[in-house]
Amino acid sequence: MTDRYAVIGHPIAHSRSPSIHARFAAQTGQDLAYDRLLAPLDGFEATARAFFAEGGRGLNVTLPFKEQAFSIADVRSPRVQAAGAANTLAWDGRTLFADNTDGLGLVRDLTGRWGQVLAGATVLMLGAGGAARGVVLPLLEAGVGRILVANRTIARAQALAARFADARVEGGGFDRLAQDAPADALLINATSAGLAEQGLPVPPAVYRRARFAYDMVYGAEPTAFLREARAAGCPASADG
């Protein structure tokens, strides 16, 4: 029997997950089908439950549904409990299990593929949604010295910082970037602005002083965030 999996989000057409999982399946000999699943912005739970009711085994969850994935799960891993967000849902026929692998993947990508040293680093995190929630704890465990979360809605950034109860995590508005951002910071975009080709209110000087700009989303072409970083003079950048 073919196991059914999918990646769910809005938008979702950009996702490379089906081709990536097809290669994994070919290597492991697993019989699986892996699709893209577009959920309405107000219909994540209904879409996810319909997928599982029709025989689906698991979902990878992307923007903007990671906090909703947390809320519908029956059982949550410690990483999900800490983040309040999930990027993976697994169904065994009775129980919906949630996990979050965003942070582990980010840390491995930054250190392994891009050679970034995280110990003692200052991280400027753009966005305070599910993607940001999932990576804060692994970054702290990797030894970063400070995480400044910047969000248009300041209360959300402050709530995220309060959730982790660690003095290294601070929350504020984008105006704090210009005031508090040191040189040699690691700039991480955890918003979906790049997918919508929207810019972010990041002062050019912040890009210029950063040592590395990383967009957690990706597309066929560099996102607006990466284009802005490069145009402002950021010395190195990549997407996830």
Kindly give the residue locations of the regions a language model identified.
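Phosphate/diphosphate ligand-binding glycine-rich loop within oxidoreductases
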Residues: 2-114
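Glycine-rich adenosine-cofactor-binding loop
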Residues: 9, 100-103, 110, 114, ...
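Rossmann-fold NAD(P) dinucleotide-binding segment
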Residues: 68, 195-213, 224, 228
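Conserved S-adenosyl-L-methionine
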Residues: 141-146, 232-235
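NAD(P)-binding Rossmann-fold cofactor-contacting core
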Residues: 144-164
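Short acidic low-complexity segments
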Residues: 167-184, 205
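Rossmann-fold NAD(P)-binding glycine/threonine-rich loop
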Residues: 211-240
